[in-house]
Amino acid sequence: MDNVIHTDDFQLEMGTAEIPAGQEERRRAERQGDGSAGECQSAVRLRRPERRQMAMVMQCPDDLVSATHPVRRVAEVVEHLDVSGFCQPIKAREGVAGRDATDPKLLVSLWLYACVRGIGSGRELARQCQENVAFQWLCGGVSVNHRLLSDFRTDHGEALDRLLTQVIASLVDKDVVKVSRVSQDGVRVRVGAGASSFRREERLEKLLDEAKQHVEELHQRLDSPESPVAAVTAKQAAARKRAARERQERLEQAIAQLPELKKRQEEAATRAGQGKCGKKIREKEPRVSTTDAEARVMKMPNGGYNPAVNVQLATDTESRAIVGVEVSNEGSDSAGLSAPMRQQVEERTAGKVEEHLLDGGYLRTQDIEEAHEQGVALFVPPKPARNPEKRGRELEPKPGDSEAVRAWKQRMKSEEGKQVYKQRAATSETVNAELRSWRGLGRITVRGLAKARCIALWCALAYNVMHFATVLLG
C-alpha cells in the first residue's frame, strides 16, 4: 500500500506526485511544536492559506451585495431617470462600425455612488471598480478606465444640470419640496492650483513668449528626421506637443483674465475712496494663476488664504433638499449672488420663492430693494456697527431709509423674523458640512469654473438621491 500524507485540503500519494518543496519540513515542524515550553506541549494546529490551490467558484454577480446595500438604491434611482442628454455625443450607432459605448446609466451610477462614498478621483474610482464588490456589482462585468470616468465626470455640464432639475421636479411633483422658503449659503472649496502659481501681468507676458518659442522649437525638433529627438515614438511626440500647447493655452487664458480683474480692482478702489484704503488697492497689481486661470485667492474658513472657488447652494428649508447649485470665483458673497440663485430655483421648480434666507455676507441694499420689488422677503442680518456705542442699534430706522429697507429692518427685529432666520443655520450649514465631509466636495482637483460646477452638481445629485431615494422610487 502506497504511503499517504494527510494534509488540510488533499491527500498526496507517494509515487504519483512529488511533495512540494518545503512542505514536508513545515509539517514536521508543526508536529514537533515550538519546544520552548517543554516536550509535553501539544503541537499547534493552524489554518494556513493555500494561495496556489485551484478551485471552481460558481457565483451570480447579483450575490456580491446584500439586498439592502445602498448601492442598489442608487442603481434603482438611476434606472428611473432620463439620461438621454448623455447619449447625444456618443458616436457608436446602429449600423456604424466601432466599439459599443459604455452605458451612460452605468457611468452615472458609478459617479453618484462614488460621491456617496466621498470618492472624488477618476483613478481611485477605477481602482474601486477592480477591488470593491459594490462597484463590481454596478459594473456587472463592464470594464471602465480612469480616463473614461474622468472625461464623463466633467464633459456633460448641461446634461448634469438637466438631471438635477429632473430629480428636483420629481420631488416637487410628489409634494416633498416646496420652495416658498429657501436658504442659501456659499462654501469656499480649495482648488488644485498652487498659491505660488499666481503671476503678475509682466511675468505672464514673459512666460507666454517663452512658451510660444518652446512650442516652435519642439515642433522643429520632433518633425526633423535628422534630429536625435525624432527617435521617439509618434505617441510620445504627440504627448510632448500637446503638453507644450496646453501650457501656452493656459497662459493665454490667464492673460485674458487680467482686464476683468483690473475692472474689479478699480471698482473696489472707487468704493474705498481716495484715502489709504483706496490707495492701497490701486497700488496692488492683479495676479492670475498659470495653472487655473479662473481660480481666485480667497479667505478660507480656517482664516488662511488659498486658491479656491465659491460654491453656492440653495436648500429648501422644509425638506432640506438642494434646489440650486452655482459656482463662481467671487471671493465675497456680497457680489450679487442671491438674485441669480433665486431665479435658478424658480426655473428648476416652476415655483415662487417668497422668503430668502441669507447670512450677513450677502447684505447689499441693492439686493434688498430688488427682492422687495419682486415680492420676496429677504432675511439677512445687518452688519455690526463699527462704533461699539452703536452696536445693537443697527436695525433702528434712519431718515434716508427706503421702503424696502424699512420693511427689512422691521422684519428682522420681529420675533417671528428671528424664529424664521434660525432655520438658515439648521439647513444650509449642515448641508454644506455633509457635502464637504462625506460627498467629495472637500477639494476640487479639476480646472475651470465649468468643470468645477460639474463636480458641485454631482455632489448635489448624490445628496438628493441618498436622502430622497425612497420618495423618488415611490
Indicate where each model-derived feature is located.
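Glycine- and acidic
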Residues: 59, 89-96, 106-114, 321-328, ...
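Anion-binding and metal-coordination hotspots
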Residues: 2-28, 32, 37-44, 48, ...
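Basic, short loop/linker segments at the boundary and entry of helix-turn-helix/winged-helix-like folds
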Residues: 64-112, 117
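Poly-acidic low-complexity segments
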Residues: 60, 78-83, 103, 145, ...
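Helical catalytic core of nucleic-acid polymerases
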Residues: 83-84, 93-104, 128-141, 146-152
